């Protein structure tokens, strides 16, 4: 595509009943090995979902350290989406789950950044950590940096406040 820093999102939560690709570690390794062989030395970001199991996260970090330059954590979290009356809010037959983003997932993003920082330090890994999830106000940026993020990204927060990055820079 010509991207200067491609990101491979292995964490999309709307895969039906299947697990996220990033939870299937052997599959993840094959995919990222292939990507690395195609892009050569171009910096590469691996986007992941939330890991409850720390042993699995360590194994993922080993894969990332070998094939990626950065881990972007996290993507949206799957959740049941209902309207104010408790009815299915998403269009489509039996489509009750969707990706939840914004402030409700910040705890998970901060947790992943802290754990990835600890893993990186313990195993002397070299990948960068991009903190994502629930960055709505400037203080959220500070929380991610203090947790160990090398960079902080915002999607939902930037949609609601297009000046968020400028406010963070001026702080």
Where is each model-derived feature located?
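Glycine-rich beta-strand-to-loop/alpha-helix junction loops that act as flexible
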Residues: 1, 47-49, 129-135, 154-156
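Conserved beta-alpha-beta core of the PfkB/ribokinase-like small-molecule kinase fold
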Residues: 1-59
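Glycine-rich phosphate-binding active-site loops on the catalytic face of alpha/beta enzymes
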Residues: 70-80, 134-135, 141-168
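Catalytic cores of alpha/beta
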Residues: 52-66, 118-122, 135-152
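Short beta-strand/loop segments at the ligand-binding rim of alpha/beta enzyme cores
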Residues: 37-49, 118-131
């Amino acid at each position: 595509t010509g991207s200067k820093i491609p990101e491979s999102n292995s964490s999309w939560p709307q895969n039906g009943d299947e697990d996220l690709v990033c939870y299937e570690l052997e599959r993840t390794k094959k995919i990222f090995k292939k990507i690395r062989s195609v892009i050569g030395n171009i910096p590469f970001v691996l986007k992941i979902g939330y890991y409850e199991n720390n042993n699995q996260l360590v194994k993922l970090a080993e894969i990332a350290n070998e094939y990626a330059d950065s881990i972007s954590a996290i993507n949206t979290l799957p959740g049941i989406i209902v309207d104010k009356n408790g009815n299915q809010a998403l269009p489509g037959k039996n489509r009750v789950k969707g990706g939840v983003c914004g402030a409700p997932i910040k705890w998970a993003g901060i947790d992943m950044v802290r754990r990835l920082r600890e893993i990186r330090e313990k195993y002397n890994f070299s990948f960068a950590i991009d903190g994502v999830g629930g960055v709505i106000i400037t203080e959220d940026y500070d929380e991610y940096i203090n947790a160990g993020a090398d960079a902080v990204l915002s999607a939902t927060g930037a949609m609601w406040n297009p000046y968020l990055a400028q406010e963070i820079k001026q702080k």
